[in-house]
Design a protein with these regions (language model features):
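Secondary-structure boundary/capping signal
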Residues: 36-37, 119, 283, 296
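Alpha-helix initiation and N-capping motif
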Residues: 9, 22-25, 38, 52, ...
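Single, function-defining residue in the core of a domain
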Residues: 2-5, 14, 19, 86, ...
Length: 327
C-alpha cells in the first residue's frame, strides 16, 4: 500500500466515524475543501480488494499491546441489511437467525479478540454466494456459497493461532457448535472452547454409556444448576463439562442455556463467566453498524463494498483505541 493509500484509508475511516448521514466520495471531497478529490476516493475504494491479511497487518501492533493468555477469541456473524442495493455475490439473501427469516444484505463473519477489556477484530470473511443454482422446490434461481460458514469459522481460528494469538477459550454460539468444529479446536489446534448446545443434542453420561451407544437428549437430563457434569457428546470422542445456567430475559421470563467446555478441570463459574464475554461481539456488531457508518455507503461493486467494510473495521478500531485510553 502506497503512502497515499495509507493516508486515504486513515482519512476515509475518520470520515466514517465522524459522519451522521450518507458517506460518499463527493461528501468527503467537499469536507476537505477539494484537497482530496472525488476521483481519489473512488480510486481508493476501487483498488485492490482488502482481505483478513490486510486487517491483521493493520491491527497487529495494537493486539500485541493487549494480548494475554486469559483472552478469548469470539467467532460470530452478522448481517448488514441493504434492501435497496443491487444484488451481487456479497449483497444477497441470507438467513437471519435473530429474525428467523431471509434478509438482503452483507453477511460478515468476524474473529474478535477480547483481552483486558478491549475488543479488536483480528479476522473477517464476507460470505460470497458465487454459485447460482435452481431451487428444486420453487424452480427459482438462488445463490449459495461454495464454502460453509463452519469452514470459514475454522479458518479464522486456524489463522489466529498461526498469528500467534494467545487465548484461553474460543467462544461461539449454537450455530457454530458442531461436533466437527469442536474436534478441530480441541484435537487439531490443541485449544479449548466454551459454547452452547441445542437441547436436541444427544449425550452419554459416561464413557461406558458412550461405548454402548446409550445416548439421551440434552433436555431430558436431570441437571442441577451451578454445578458441572462430565458428559460425552454424540460424535465427539473426548469428554466435555456440561453446565446448565438459568437466566432471566428482559421481559422477566426465564430461560435455560446448556454450555459445554472442553477443559474438564474448571468450575461452573469459570465456564459461565468466560462465556458471558461473548457479549462483546454483540457490542462490536452494534458499534460497527451505528458508529462506523457500515451501512451508509452507496458503493455498488463487490470491491468497493468490501473496501468500505474494511474501512469501517478500521474506524471501529480507532473508536476502541479511544475508549481504551479513556479507561
Amino acid at each position: 500500500m502506497s503512502m497515499e493509500r495509507k493516508e486515504l484509508l486513515d482519512l476515509y475511516s475518520d470520515y466514517l466515524v465522524a459522519s451522521f448521514g450518507s458517506t460518499t466520495a463527493t461528501g468527503l471531497s467537499q469536507l476537505m475543501d477539494g484537497e482530496v478529490s472525488h476521483d481519489q476516493v473512488t480510486r481508493f475504494l476501487s483498488g485492490t480488494k482488502k482481505t483478513a491479511a490486510d486487517l491483521w497487518c493493520h491491527v497487529k501492533p495494537l493486539v500485541r499491546q493487549i494480548q494475554s493468555d486469559a483472552a478469548v477469541l469470539i467467532i460470530d456473524d452478522s448481517i448488514e441489511e441493504k434492501p435497496y442495493t443491487d444484488e451481487n455475490e456479497i449483497v444477497c439473501w441470507h438467513y437471519d437467525h435473530a429474525k428467523n427469516q431471509q434478509v438482503k444484505g452483507i453477511n460478515f463473519l468476524s474473529a474478535l479478540y477480547y483481552s483486558q477489556e478491549v475488543s479488536l477484530p483480528v479476522g473477517f470473511e464476507l460470505i460470497a454466494k458465487t454459485e447460482i443454482y435452481v431451487d428444486s422446490k420453487t424452480g427459482k434461481q438462488k445463490r449459495r456459497s461454495p464454502i460453509t460458514k463452519n469452514e470459514y469459522c475454522k479458518e479464522l481460528i486456524r489463522q489466529a493461532i498461526h498469528n500467534q494469538l494467545p487465548f484461553r477459550f474460543a467462544l461461539f454460539d449454537v450455530w457454530f457448535s458442531s461436533s466437527d468444529n469442536m474436534k478441530f479446536i480441541k484435537q487439531q489446534q490443541k485449544r479449548d472452547f466454551v459454547c452452547p448446545l441445542k437441547t436436541n443434542r444427544k449425550v452419554a453420561l459416561s464413557r461406558q454409556d458412550k461405548g454402548q451407544g446409550r445416548y439421551q437428549r440434552l433436555d431430558t437430563l436431570e441437571l442441577e444448576t451451578n454445578v458441572v457434569r462430565e458428559i460425552y457428546l454424540e460424535g465427539v470422542e473426548f469428554p466435555l463439562l456440561l453446565a446448565k445456567e438459568i437466566f432471566t430475559n428482559e421481559d422477566g421470563s426465564t430461560g435455560i442455556i446448556y454450555l459445554v467446555c472442553s477443559d474438564t478441570s474448571i468450575s461452573f463459574d469459570e465456564i459461565t463467566t468466560n462465556y458471558r464475554k461473548r457479549w462483546q461481539v454483540e457490542c462490536y456488531h452494534k458499534s460497527l453498524k451505528q458508529n462506523a457508518s457500515l451501512a451508509k455507503s452507496p458503493t455498488q461493486t463487490v470491491t468497493t463494498q468490501t473496501n468500505h467494510f474494511f474501512a469501517a473495521l478500521c474506524g471501529y478500531i480507532k473508536l476502541e483505541q479511544l475508549e481504551g485510553t479513556s479507561k
